[in-house]
Amino acid sequence: MQPLKRIPSIANFKKLIILTAMCCSSFFYSNTYAENSTLAAVPQVELSQYLGLWYEVARKPMYFQKECAQDVTARYTVNEYGNIAVDNRCTDMDGNILRSLGEGFVVNEPFNSKLKVSFLPESVRWMPVGRGDYWILKIDSAYQMVLVGEPKRKYLWLLSRDPHPDEAKVTEYLRYAQRVGFNLKDLIRTKQTE
């Protein structure tokens, strides 16, 4: 004869449902809070250290990068107007190098952590239209890795001075992005062949 099995009581089911609801609501609340909270840029960026070549490690989908298959880089220099010249490059599926030139305008001097970037033709870049937010959200003290995003959390880039950075550091930066409200379900990891 088999021993009788204990049937959970209604009270235990209610407790389980309440506990599950509390856990789910706290998870939902924390994610919603992060997504709706104000996004903060780093306190200050030393532009002279930020300039130079960066390799893209990962990104959220961006319409102007839809043809980029690998080897995405960004080079930042100071242009003749004292703004940031942006030279983005990538390789498409056919092996062609694609290039996009733009200009970044610092909007929070002297802190230099928030820019507006335009990829409009050079002759009309002076107009304050067609400029996207480019906020530096996290950067290490040696300026070797940077997380860049924008306040609506639709776009995000993880850049590194090394085409193949330490995976633990990559994970650290991506976890930070999640903590401040970025949904990384559509994150694209960039292939670098260098």
Where are these regions (language model features)?
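Bacterial N-terminal signal peptides
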Residues: 17-27
